[in-house]
Amino acid sequence: MQYDAEPPEIVRRKVGENPVVIFTVSTCYLCLAVKRLFRGLGVNTTVFELDEEPDGKELEKALMRLSSAVPVVFVGGKLLGSVDRVLASHISGMLVPLLKEAGALWL
């Protein structure tokens, strides 16, 4: 499956000026793990629970053009990816510098 590189407008509006945005589903355990990872790093995230948002279905459809599964994480307005990319970035030591560059982490 080919994914779009550029987020659709509805996603760009939600991502806005927030350093870290996570699109999740409230019952997804992988989503919970990603949210806890960022919280454990001391990052204040903006979370959109797709199953609780009024425009959740539209958002989900737009996000599936970017990633095959939730959570879908944006750092500094750029798509980081889903749980696999987040964890790989964390394990490789690349996540913290990305968060610092985005202004989400100061230490």
Task: Show which residues each predicted segment covers.
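C-terminal alpha-helical interaction module
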Residues: Q2-V11, G16-E17, G93, L99-L107
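Local sequence-structure signature of Cys/Sec-based thiol-disulfide redox active-site neighborhoods
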Residues: D4-F48
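Short secondary-structure boundary/capping segments
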Residues: R12-R13, P71, L87
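Ordered, helix-dominated protein-protein interaction surfaces in large eukaryotic regulatory proteins
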Residues: L30, R36-G40, K61, R65, ...
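Short beta->alpha junction loops
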Residues: E49-P54
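Structural motif
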Residues: D55-E60
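Non-catalytic, surface beta->alpha helical segment in thiol-disulfide oxidoreductase systems
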Residues: F74-L107
